[in-house]
From Swiss-Prot:
Source organism of the structure: Bos taurus
Protein name: CapZ-interacting protein
Compositionally biased tracts (Basic residues): 159-176
Lineage: Eukaryota, Metazoa, Chordata, Craniata, Vertebrata
Complex and partners: Interacts with CAPZA2 and CAPZB.
Biological role stated in the UniProt entry: Stress-induced phosphorylation of CAPZIP may regulate the ability of F-actin-capping protein to remodel actin filament assembly.
GO cellular component: cytosol; early endosome; WASH complex
Residue positions, PTM Phosphothreonine: 124, 222, 306
Underlying gene: RCSD1
PTM sites of type Phosphoserine: 68, 82-83, 105, 108, 116, 120, 123, 126-127, 135, 143, 177, 179, 216, 224, 249, 271, 302-303
GO molecular function: actin filament binding; phosphatidylinositol phosphate binding; retromer complex binding
Positions of the UniProt region annotated as Disordered: 25-83, 99-381
UniProt PTM: Dephosphorylation results in its dissociation from CAPZA2.
Segments of skewed composition (Polar residues): 352-381
Record keywords, A-Z: Phosphoprotein
Amino acid sequence: MEERPAQTNAIVDDSAPPSVAQLAGRFREQAAAAKETPASKPTRRKPPCSLPLFPSKVELGQNGEEKSLPSANHPPKVKVKSSPLIEKLQANLVFDPAALLPGASPKSPGFKAMVSPFHSPPSTPSSPGVRSRPSEPEEVPVSFDQPPEGSHLPCYNKVRTRGSIKRRPPSRRFRRSQSDCGELGEFRAVEPSQENGAKEESGDEVFPAKSKAPGSPPLRRTSSRTEKLEEKSRAVGEAQEPEKIAGGSEEGAGQHPARASSSEAEDGCGSPKEERPAGEQAEEPTEVKERVASEEEEPRQSSQDTEELEEGAVEEEPPQPPPGGGAGGHSPEQGTSEEKQDEGASLKPGCSPNSGAHAQPDTSSEVPRTEDNTPVQDTKM
């Protein structure tokens, strides 16, 4: 700041003509002093170097201002080159990101010991660069590549929903498949049972096989269904037989329907031997017991039916004994008719032995209805 007033004094002295040579010498001395001061100051301080540059601008301002612009542009370049502290800082900045590149290394406790030696010798800018560069390829695969690959990949395999998706649908599919298999098993069980029912209607040889079938628990329902079909078909067949025979012989027309009605009425009364004439001798006794129990629950209905039959029989004459030719199909029923009547009377007082012998041929259509109702209730029991 003291140089500027000195310059103003020199300008004032320039007004005197003899002092021009003296002023020129002073300017040269000031320029030499200005050059010497920046050379001595950079070791101590860098910012003061800008101060002596201003008088150079003033000196050059008189002769030409063009030289002042390059002189003003040079000092920032000189700052970067001439400062050893800045070089050290720049060296540290260059090597610090190299040490920070691993990123995960300072977080993990094992790598802290490896990072500490790099921080200790930053005074030598060349040594940490040489050490950090070979260490980078060693640390980078360990920190970034291996640990995430080793730890996260199995975690993704555990956490992913694909595993759950693979687990859940099989259970539902297995349930559906099991249910389908169960239904198919039931249908398969129903088909042979129905075939057995068709064979039972045709012959008596299949009944022992059928008696074994209800013993297995899964085939009980199917056997009950087949029993319903068999009994219904038999009732219809028994109702149709007297009509066919009536067309053959006039004498049998009044006798066979009465026999059919007698056997059907006895079936409604609930005699235990009702199954024998129909060919059901090999059926299980448990089914007979269930039928007897279900028939005991409804003795009133059967008693009313038998009373109506008796009233109708009193009005008409009893039928004549059947001829041997017309009763060929019902020969077993004739032999056991008296026994059935006695047993039916002993089991239930509502059923009278005369109901079968004096039954009307017209009421034969009414009795099969009661017979059709009883087996449905038997299967429900």
